């Protein structure tokens, strides 16, 4: 009998059981939290992850277009195109998307963190944020290198302008600050304008998460 190596991605997901008038109903923990308008963005930003997050946001909008969505981010970054699919959907849908950094938000993760609804972007106390310029790699014939180099520079300029708008920083400052890996603590992220507040405790129940 062969021993199958442990794959953490296939580890059991916790289940929760609810009592209803029709009996018991079980959910995996992420589906149960989705009912509370909570979405997780954990790990590398790539097309499959982006597709799932976009689908969840569209579903929650259809369920209640007036209720805020909470996007919890713990990501080292990843694909620009996949990240922009999430970003554009955040802006396209009617509900505000509140972003919360848990662990880390680096690269595209930091960009999406800053792109949450103004006044509703948060870091937990020991989270960290890292901003830098887009990374690119290309293999092909020499005549295509210039084309791809121009595209990477265009993406860099666009993302810097968007981050400047989200943070309130000057474009030139953002361009300088993202030229190399730039790590920020939770409070430094507030000072920079990437997030609005460090959350050490859950806000009071009087602070409604629904739009008025």
Swiss-Prot record:
GO terms for biological process: protein quality control for misfolded or incompletely synthesized proteins. Its EC number is 3.4.21.92. The active site is at 107 (nucleophile), 132. The keyword Transmembrane helix does not apply. GO terms for molecular function: ATP-dependent peptidase activity; ATPase binding; serine-type endopeptidase activity. GO terms for cellular component: cytoplasm; endopeptidase Clp complex. It comes from the Bacteria. Signal peptide: none annotated. It is an enzyme of class 3 (hydrolase). It catalyses: Hydrolysis of proteins to small peptides in the presence of ATP and magnesium. alpha-casein is the usual test substrate. In the absence of ATP, only oligopeptides shorter than five residues are hydrolyzed (such as succinyl-Leu-Tyr-|-NHMec, and Leu-Tyr-Leu-|-Tyr-Trp, in which cleavage of the -Tyr-|-Leu- and -Tyr-|-Trp bonds also occurs). Belongs to the peptidase S14 family. PANTHER family: ATP-DEPENDENT CLP PROTEASE PROTEOLYTIC SUBUNIT. Fourteen ClpP subunits assemble into 2 heptameric rings which stack back to back to give a disk-like structure with a central cavity, resembling the structure of eukaryotic proteasomes. Cleaves peptides in various proteins in a process that requires ATP hydrolysis. Has a chymotrypsin-like activity. Plays a major role in the degradation of misfolded proteins. This is ATP-dependent Clp protease proteolytic subunit. It comes from Pseudoalteromonas atlantica (strain T6c / ATCC BAA-1087).
């Amino acid at each position: 009998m062969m021993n199958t190596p442990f794959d953490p991605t296939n580890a059991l997901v916790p289940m929760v059981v609810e009592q209803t008038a029709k009996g018991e109903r079980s959910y995996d923990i992420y589906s149960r939290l989705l009912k509370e308008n909570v979405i997780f963005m954990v790990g590398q930003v790539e097309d499959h992850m982006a597709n799932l997050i976009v689908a969840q946001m569209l579903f929650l909008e259809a369920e209640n277009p007036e209720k805020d969505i909470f996007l919890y981010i713990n990501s080292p970054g990843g694909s620009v195109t996949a990240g922009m699919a999430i970003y554009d959907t955040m802006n396209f849908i009617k509900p505000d998307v509140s972003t919360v950094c848990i662990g880390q938000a680096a690269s595209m993760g930091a960009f999406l963190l800053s792109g949450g609804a103004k006044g509703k972007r948060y870091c937990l106390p020991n989270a960290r944020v890292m901003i830098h310029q887009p990374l690119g790699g290309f293999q092909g014939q020499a005549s295509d290198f210039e084309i791809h180099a121009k595209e990477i520079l265009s993406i860099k300029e666009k993302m810097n302008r968007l981050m400047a708008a989200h943070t309130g920083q000057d474009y030139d400052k953002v361009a300088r600050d993202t030229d190399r890996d730039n790590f920020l603590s939770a409070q430094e992220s507030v000072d920079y304008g990437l997030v609005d507040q460090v959350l050490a405790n859950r806000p009071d129940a009087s602070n409604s998460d629904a739009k008025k």
